[in-house]
Amino acid sequence: MTATVNEAPASTSKGATGRIARVIGPVVDVEFSADTMPDQNNALTTQVTMGGTTQTVTLEVASHLGDNMVRAISLKPTDGMVRGAAVVDTGAPISVPVGNATLGHVFNAIGECLNLEEGEQLEVHERWPIHRKAPNFDQLESRTTMFETGIKVIDLLTPYVQGGKIGLFGGAGVGKTVLIQEMIQRVAQNHGGVSVFAGVGERTREGNDLIGEMAEAGVFDKTALVFGQMDEPPGTRLRVALSALTMAEYFRDVQNQDVLLFIDNIFRFTQAGSEVSTLLGRMPSAVGYQPTLADEMGVLQERITSTRGHSITSLQAIYVPADDYTDPAPATTFAHLDATTELSREIASRGLYPAVDPLTSTSRILDPLYIAQDHYDTAVRVKQILQRNKELQDIIAILGVDELSEEDKLTVSRARRIQQFLSQNTYMAEKFTGVEGSTVPLKETIEGFSKIADGELDHVAEQAFFNVGGLEDVERNWARIQKETA
């Protein structure tokens, strides 16, 4: 049961009362008088009684049907809703609490706090509507500062931008949510500041695990969490990202903070939009997606941006259906991102985590204009070695390694060491592997890969590079291996 929230009075007066004319799943048609029709995106409320308990259900106006009828999408289950029931127009869009009061609390898409003790009250002094305009063009500020994570494969080959949008792409079970949780842990340790997490259509168990891990790490009190899980109606899953983003915008625009916004999973946002579009009777577009896919994605992504002096840095997990990157959902998201981290099932199957594909992952600041020359040169050399190794795999599969030239044998040998060294022991995996997590400074990352590419570590066995932090760990492993084989 949701605890009582003590809020400041809304600035808008409530509108008129209508009547429910039809209920079809989460779609509710409501009739108003001609002079009291609610605006598009207005929040409507109705009382539903089931099992002796009465609860308030929020609806959002999605379209005007004519004949004084509006079609609304329910943000809660419609069980118990009946024709003829009264519906009140709130006169305003859905709004959510903003400010410091949100930190250390869990909310749903309509701003109800879910983790208060019975009888506890949350003092909310301000609420913002979730439908807002993106910042004006003259307020935007382009950022090119690198956001160091301490994860070797990311910092070297797909450097993140402070104030940028970062996408973690991957199919089912390759490590998107674990990597998001890892980033939350690292950001709290190394960067501080305020974070907002949006759980969009993901598993309730994962949300519960995340809250527990954040509490253990001591970062829960600096984070606002907004959840619309996969068992909730599509209207909730479609709006929860906007609710979380609104909270993040307040910290950016009013408190002038640099904010971190985590969204897991953007695909579920698209999927919810497709469900709502079908419920509203719109003609589907490519692969069954909604015809407004690009517009809906743009409305969300254009608000996630940096303004003069302040930024929202977002990490977005993006599920790739059937590992098909040409699917319209992930393809539409690509255009909005500053860095893309693609997680590979083939790399994950070899037990190399994080399973980042070094050849397909990209970043707009992987350029000597924005990063140090030695960083750029090392990244290019590493990619060249890995690309050449990939080209040689067919020859190796047919003829074997012995048929390669001496130069190609060296390339393959170094590529294998690089692949092993790209894996890293993470904090989130400590409880599974028993290996302590590590944060590797960028300087050490560049030095390590440069030495491998130069052949300075050709004498070290491949297994010494597996699941380690920096070169010190490699040397320690190599000494242990030599001792065991002596």
Swiss-Prot record:
It is a peripheral membrane protein. It catalyses: ATP + H2O + 4 H(+)(in) = ADP + phosphate + 5 H(+)(out). Coiled coil: none annotated. It holds the Pfam family ATP-synt_ab. One of its GO terms (molecular function) is proton-transporting ATP synthase activity, rotational mechanism. Its EC number is 7.1.2.2. The keyword Flavoprotein does not apply. InterPro entries: AAA+_ATPase, ATP-synt_VA_C, ATP_synth_F1_bsu, ATPase_a/bsu_AS, ATPase_alpha/beta_chains, ATPase_F1/V1/A1_a/bsu_N, ATPase_F1/V1/A1_a/bsu_N_sf, ATPase_F1/V1/A1_a/bsu_nucl-bd. The keyword Nucleotide-binding applies. Keywords: ATP synthesis, ATP-binding, Cell membrane, CF(1), Hydrogen ion transport, Ion transport, Membrane, Nucleotide-binding, Translocase, Transport. It is found in: Cell membrane. GO terms for cellular component: plasma membrane; proton-transporting ATP synthase complex. It comes from the Bacteria. ATP binds at residues 170-177. F-type ATPases have 2 components, CF(1) - the catalytic core - and CF(0) - the membrane proton channel. CF(1) has five subunits: alpha(3), beta(3), gamma(1), delta(1), epsilon(1). CF(0) has three main subunits: a(1), b(2) and c(9-12). The alpha and beta chains form an alternating ring which encloses part of the gamma chain. CF(1) is attached to CF(0) by a central stalk formed by the gamma and epsilon chains, while a peripheral stalk is formed by the delta and b chains. Produces ATP from ADP in the presence of a proton gradient across the membrane. The catalytic sites are hosted primarily by the beta subunits. Belongs to the ATPase alpha/beta chains family. This is ATP synthase subunit beta. The lineage of its organism: Bacteria, Bacillati, Actinomycetota, Actinomycetes, Kineosporiales. The gene is atpD.
